[in-house]
């Protein structure tokens, strides 16, 4: 019940003021940060420890490439994420995907410094696509919202039509990595009217789980002639051996 009142308070503040003066996580009053209170900032699982150089996941020790990438090297050039997919971030991303579009600003605010520091050579931003039916059902593509905000902030052009989702695919959550790859095979392609040849692309998404979706999308972009495809997400699932 306490959580319900906090959520109602957050929504009321936004409706009246048009600004975030309450923490998007707990509803407490904000002072030093634009989106999160001090307590939540201290508890959020930022992806700031050891990470895999390739997929950017949180790993248990300081080694260059995680075992999963060694076993199945992804097609993207590299990937990074602002948070580890655990704790309150899991709840917030679920809310983001089920109507709470305002969270795009808070997430993009944490992705922006990574974009500037890690992907300085980016020529173009893109996002993981959804089918028109899926966008209609949800009302928006959450990855497009993130990419749009990041493009406005950094000035890197956003190519909204770079990738096309050609068909509906089965829910990915319960599938193994091999099943995900089979499920997504041929489901993402580069739009024939877009040009990515010779460009460095940053692909935006909300969550990286196994990385299969990002890898399939990157493969299509690289086949179309892009120089590189880096991936930037709100959060990524940590290395399997870690208990975060």
Residues covered by each model-derived region:
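Glycine-rich phosphate/pyrophosphate-handling loop used in enzymes and phosphotransfer proteins
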Residues: 1-204, 209-244
């Amino acid at each position: 019940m306490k959580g319900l009142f906090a959520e109602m308070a957050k929504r009321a503040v936004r409706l009246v003021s048009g600004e975030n003066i309450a923490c998007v996580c707990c509803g407490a009053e904000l002072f030093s940060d634009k989106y999160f209170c001090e307590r939540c900032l201290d508890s959020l699982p930022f992806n700031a420890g050891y990470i895999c150089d390739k997929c950017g996941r949180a790993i248990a020790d300081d080694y260059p490439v995680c075992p999963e990438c060694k076993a199945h090297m992804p097609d993207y050039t590299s990937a990074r994420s602002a948070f580890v997919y655990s704790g309150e971030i899991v709840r917030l991303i679920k809310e983001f995907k089920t109507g709470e579009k305002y969270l795009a600003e808070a997430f993009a605010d944490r992705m922006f410094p990574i974009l500037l520091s890690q992907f300085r050579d980016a020529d173009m931003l893109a996002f993981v696509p959804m089918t028109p039916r899926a966008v209609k059902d949800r009302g928006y593509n959450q990855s497009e919202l993130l990419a749009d905000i990041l493009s406005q902030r950094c000035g890197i052009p956003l190519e909204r039509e770079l990738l096309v989702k050609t068909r509906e695919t089965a829910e990915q959550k319960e599938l193994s990595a091999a099943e995900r790859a089979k499920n997504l095979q041929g489901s993402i392609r580069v739009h024939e009217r877009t040009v990515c040849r010779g460009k460095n692309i940053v692909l935006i998404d909300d969550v990286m789980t196994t990385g299969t979706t990002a890898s399939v999308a990157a493969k299509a972009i690289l086949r179309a002639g892009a120089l590189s495809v880096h991936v930037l997400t709100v959060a990524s699932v940590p290395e399997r051996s870690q208990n975060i």
